[in-house]
Amino acid sequence: ASSLVNIKRKNSNEMLVLAPSELDYKPKKCQRCFYLEKNHKIGPKDFPPPVFSRFDVVQQAYYKDKNTSDLTKELPSGRIMNKDELPGRVVSETLKDNKGREFILGGRPDIVIKFDKGGYGIIDFKTTKISDDKSENYKHQLEAYAQIFSKPGSTKSKKTPLLNPITHMGILQFDPSDIQSHNNNSCDMRMNISYSPLKRDEKDFFENITKIIDILDR
């Protein structure tokens, strides 16, 4: 009965920590792979190609000082919070799934917004093929960050700030379109941009978390 209350890592006293980025794709792709990776640290080092990280760095550098309504007209006026306001890694307090099992959420958010008239937003930049419902592919990741900022915890060095309410979440998509010009060493590439908003759904989130912990608790 006690195993239903507090899951520890196999052969360890560490609390179960789930990263927002692993809540959507990995458990669906291969449950056994996810089990082995989380419980026994066995698995491939499947990092995305470095070029996508470069896209992200360039996009964030361009938008970091702009009003958030410049990202998309679907967002109200506000500003992107800077590194001095947010720790490099944010974590939740101890949470419980639908079966009372404890876990912590922890990760590094892409874009966190403070709106001028109150409330906060969590936006992720993705270089991808544009689709209207793209945010559905990342719904648990985005809600995980909403949970973290609504129920913040602390790392050994820094406390995660309370940001409440989270009023907007979504994916800002960048899709390479065409090259405008070039010279010997560079080219000017144009990208189409589209915003895919997401409504919060805590019920669905905790149902998914419960399924994930069921996988890990087999």
What is each PLM-predicted segment?
Residues 40, 127-130, 150-154, 217:
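Hydrophobic/aromatic-lined pockets within catalytic cores
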Residues 104-106, 137, 164:
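A generic fold-level signal
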Residues 1-119:
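Metal-dependent nuclease catalytic cores that hydrolyze phosphodiester bonds in DNA/RNA
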Residues 57, 135-140:
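Short, conserved loop/turn and helix-capping segments at secondary-structure boundaries
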Residues 3-20, 152-218:
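Metal-dependent nuclease catalytic regions and adjoining charged, substrate-binding loops involved
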